């Protein structure tokens, strides 16, 4: 099955061997997305809402570059560093998924940079 690499303009160059997204057989797989600027610096330290918005906007760019929309998202994996930020993260998350919500899970864990508060990976099925 052929796959296409998805790298939207303005996306940071990953600091590990992966790409922001891949498209295969109508499915977009978005790598774990952190609140990084194009130079891999964490944006909005100590602001879980702003970091979540930045992460979801980056995910949206990956999915739109592949030809989809956020309505095509079927699953999200959410990683947070502290449960105290859960409500703030969910508030912004709900703005990006106002209708039928995708399935998801959320766990607390450490992230690659200590200033990062949230990481999200997504799967979207693009209508053919």
Swiss-Prot record:
Transmembrane segments: none annotated. GO terms for cellular component: cytosol. Gene3D superfamilies: RutC-like. Keywords: Hydrolase. GO terms for molecular function: deaminase activity. SUPFAM superfamilies: YjgF-like. Its EC number is 3.5.-.-. One of its GO terms (biological process) is nitrogen utilization. It catalyses: (Z)-3-aminoacrylate + H2O + H(+) = 3-oxopropanoate + NH4(+). It comes from the Bacteria. Involved in pyrimidine catabolism. Catalyzes the deamination of 3-aminoacrylate to malonic semialdehyde, a reaction that can also occur spontaneously. RutC may facilitate the reaction and modulate the metabolic fitness, rather than catalyzing essential functions. Belongs to the RutC family. This is 3-aminoacrylate deaminase RutC. It comes from Enterobacter sp. (strain 638). The gene is rutC.
């Amino acid at each position: 099955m052929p796959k296409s690499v998805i790298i939207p303009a303005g996306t940071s160059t990953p600091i590990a061997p992966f790409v922001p997204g891949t498209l295969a057989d109508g499915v977009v797989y978005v790598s774990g997305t952190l609140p990084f600027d194009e130079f891999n610096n964490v944006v909005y330290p100590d602001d879980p809402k702003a970091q979540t918005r930045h992460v979801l906007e980056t995910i949206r760019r990956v999915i739109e570059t592949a030809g989809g929309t956020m309505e095509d998202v079927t699953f999200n994996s959410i990683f947070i560093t502290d449960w105290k930020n859960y409500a703030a993260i969910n508030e912004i998350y709900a703005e990006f998924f106002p209708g039928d919500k995708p399935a998801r899970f959320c766990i607390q864990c450490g992230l690659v940079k200590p200033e990062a508060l949230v990481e999200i990976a997504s799967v979207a099925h693009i209508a053919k």
